[in-house]
């Protein structure tokens, strides 16, 4: 039977010359865009699919685009989108491709509009990347907390290099009385080592802890140093407990503390400190603020951030946080593993996370048992 167009949806038709819009065969859809399969190499075919998606994404305010394929184009299409056994694949960064069947001839695939995906990533980014002051200055601290200096400032080694830049600036501006870098070896350590080594070849990072890498970084680049290094912690939980032990062992007074962690993990670090040291005034200042936008049908950062994760890794880290922060039997809160204090998840964040799961599937970072607390 003839193919029926889906009302209100844009369509891209992938087909052979025989199934082109010029064909007289009424069973083939013409679509809003036609990408012809003609035996060219996979990269060229893939680029043409991306181009059609980008064109529709620029003009379409709806949430879905249908890709209709036929004949030999199907196999090329599956390879182009990196099709997986769970029925998903990707058109660049435009979103998930979900399999649907139409009779025996056509396979229809749904793509989530990248503009909505960018917005949802930003919602998660803002929620996870807490900043309690707009800028880390004495004036801001005085205005909000009535203090010119915090007792302690901590940089956690899970951060990207931007965290080192913030710490160095804070040291020069005397934002705190004492400075600590916390971090042994964890799931982000090797990435940090490689970033520093690639950008600053004179800084040797092999086998160093995160605290040692950042210490060498701020010394070499900014000529400053932290007062203390904590080099044994391996995860967000013992980042906090080992830090508190260090403060106690060195008789460091701590009524107020600035926490600076990677933006993806800042909220969890705050919740961890609230569990183990509820009487300390916590000042959150995530190491960066990332804003994601749709650009030419792809997701990109609106401005460069020093040492920033690639987009795929950033999304994976963000999506891994929401199940951890959710206070249920599977989360890290009191109702679950009891690693952190209760965190309230706003409905807007829950909705954004749910929609991102439609785009990326279960793209969350699983906890690595190698870095669990002993």
Annotate the PLM regions.
Residues 293-357:
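A conserved mid-domain beta-alpha-beta active-site/ligand-binding segment of alpha/beta enzyme cores
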Residues 118-308, 367-374:
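A structural signal for short, hydrophobic/glycine-enriched beta-strand patches
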Residues 1-30, 171, 178, 187-189:
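Phosphate-coordination/substrate-recognition cap region in phosphate-metabolizing enzymes
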Residues 2-6, 85-94, 177-181, 279-286:
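Short hydrophobic/aromatic-enriched beta-strand-loop microsegments
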Residues 84-109:
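Domain-level recognition of soluble alpha/beta enzyme cores
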Residues 26-44, 229:
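Short glycine/proline- and acidic residue-enriched helix-loop micro-motifs
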Residues 60-69, 258-260:
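Beta-strand elements within well-structured catalytic alpha/beta cores of enzymes
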Residues 1-7, 102-118, 309-323:
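Conserved histidine-centered catalytic loops in small-molecule metabolism enzymes
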């Amino acid at each position: 039977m003839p193919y029926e167009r889906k009302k209100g949806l844009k369509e891209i038709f992938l087909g052979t010359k025989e199934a082109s819009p010029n064909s007289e065969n009424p069973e083939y859809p013409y679509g809003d865009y036609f990408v012809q399969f003609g035996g060219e190499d996979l990269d060229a075919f893939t680029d043409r699919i991306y181009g059609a998606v980008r064109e529709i994404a620029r003009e379409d305010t709806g949430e879905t685009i249908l890709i209709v394929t036929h004949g030999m184009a199907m196999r090329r299409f599956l390879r182009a989108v990196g099709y997986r056994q769970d029925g998903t694949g990707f058109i660049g960064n435009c979103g998930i491709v979900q399999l649907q069947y139409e009779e025996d001839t056509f396979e229809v695939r749904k793509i989530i509009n990248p503009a909505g995906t960018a917005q949802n990533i930003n919602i998660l980014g803002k929620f996870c990347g807490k900043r309690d002051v707009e800028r880390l200055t004495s004036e801001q601290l005085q205005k909000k907390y009535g203090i010119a200096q915090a007792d302690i400032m901590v940089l956690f080694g899970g951060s990207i290099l931007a965290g080192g830049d913030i710490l160095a600036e804070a040291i020069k501006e005397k934002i705190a009385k004492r400075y600590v870098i916390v971090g042994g070896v964890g799931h982000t350590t090797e990435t940090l080592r490689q970033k520093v080594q690639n950008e600053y070849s004179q800084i040797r990072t092999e086998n160093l802890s995160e605290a040692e890498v950042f210490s060498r970084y701020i010394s070499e680049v900014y000529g400053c140093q932290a007062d203390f290094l904590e080099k044994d912690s391996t995860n967000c939980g013992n980042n906090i407990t080992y830090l508190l032990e260090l403060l106690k062992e060195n008789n460091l007074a701590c009524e107020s503390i600035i926490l600076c962690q990677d933006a993806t993990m800042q909220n969890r670090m705050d919740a961890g400190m609230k569990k183990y040291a509820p009487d300390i005034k916590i000042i959150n200042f995530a190491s960066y603020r990332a804003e994601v936008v749709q650009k030419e049908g792809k997701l990109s950062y609106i401005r460069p951030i020093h040492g920033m994760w690639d987009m795929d890794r950033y999304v994976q880290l963000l999506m891994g946080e929401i199940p951890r922060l959710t206070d249920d039997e599977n989360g890290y809160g009191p109702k679950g593993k009891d690693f952190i204090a209760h965190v309230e998840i706003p409905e807007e964040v829950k909705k954004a996370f749910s929609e991102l799961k439609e785009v990326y599937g279960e793209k969350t970072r699983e906890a690595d048992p190698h870095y669990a607390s002993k």
